[in-house]
């Protein structure tokens, strides 16, 4: 807790977050999807208690639940009730808080999950179209529905393609909005926010990321973004330091105020190269939109696993290109520093301390409230979910006024709607290995896995899991696909595991090794908990950790018993070799352990 966002459980938390900030003079953007009802409600109530009525608040709530089922995974309920929540939030804000945008349709997460420019646009625009259809079914006119959407795109390092992508997005959205019945200029204009690529940041020589972010920010400006977030150069290591965050902010200020970059609208218009690239992307996106329609629409494409498979294969191919050197990443697979250092100062947070403080604050809120009023408000929220009557955001606001917590609101809805149970898709046979055939390093890795399998009489078994609330699964999915192609027997567990459940699954599977993927900063507490669980059950399999973590944390976990750690940029052939070594070492140690 406290290492991947701010903890908001009550109105008091929201008020503390915005203490000293006048909410009638500040626009607020919140990335919230699964728990959008209580979080938006807490913000509305905190503003009210600051003296700012709903009609005077401004900002954006992401409220883009469809992409959560595809990539980010912060869903709670099944798609159907979740789409009702999306619509209720949009309808309430349209009536009571018209300056607050109800939907920010995200393509950024698709790029982070592996999508190229075409697939990113197709999935994003398809989701936008689905939201407009949902709002239209609830009685909102097409012009109003389309005008209440904004879009959020990632901007990577393929400079010209990224500019063309943003230009094509505006063209395509105009076509979609018009097809939905919109006619006003505002409804047919695509409003966008962009963020530089997180996936492209490297832990090796992180100063190089300053150049990457600058080039990406230039592409976003040339492409016509209305607002921009520039990532900090040290985000591949940990939470950004204050100095790195300031430099990221200043990067776009320098581009805006010192270069003249923003003085001309669409400066690439008329370039044969740019116009043909834009037209080509738009044509390919239209074909992808038709393919989604052929699946039965975007929700059907989610439920069939079509979207996840497309993203996995795209991400695996990209990783194979990097690992083989066919795609250059300076400082990682070419022009590598001869004396790499990990001496960067990174921001550290004590999650246990943050959680203890948060629990005390929640207890204080509960002690001061009227329990009967809370129970009545929560019951009305659940009743509205059950019978379909009433606006869920309005009722969630009543709950937060009574000082219900975010968790209590969620549990009230959960009493009516069961949690979404996401299936773990197949690892995608050949998704990675097919792109490395003939590669000497890959042949060496698969050869070692094969020799280990012949010695033991079966393929080496690995369980891959993500612990806690970490929903970023691109890395885990690609590693699972690559290891299966290398010859491992891979069991990839569903998201949001606890140490005890991973230990039980590893024992039931007869695993030789357990791999944990961590991108949320919660690795210390959770991985140590897993080691304790395995020790409790006398399970001798080694545990390895991959993801983003400071070097000091890696050393700490190795001292606690982790067999190996793999940071960003580790080639998957090297990971396969290291896993074999860990398994072999553990097997050699078992007789001695048994004798003791």
For the regions a protein language model found, what residue spans apply to each?
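Catalytic alpha/beta active-site cores
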Residues: 1-156, 180-193, 221, 227-231, ...
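Alpha-helix capping and helix-loop boundary segments enriched in small/acidic/polar residues
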Residues: 1-9, 30-34, 70-84, 109-123, ...
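Generic, well-ordered alpha-helical scaffold segments in large soluble proteins
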Residues: 11-21, 42-46, 89-96, 124-138, ...
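Short beta-strand/loop segments at the ligand-binding rim of alpha/beta enzyme cores
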Residues: 189-192, 458-461, 536-546
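Flexible, glycine-rich loop/tail regions that form catalytic "lids" or insertion modules at the edges
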Residues: 242, 253, 257-442, 507, ...
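The C-terminal output helix
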Residues: 581-594
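Cofactor-cradling patches in redox/metallo enzymes
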Residues: 270, 476-583
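Active-site capping/gating regions of soluble enzymes
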Residues: 122-127, 131, 150-334
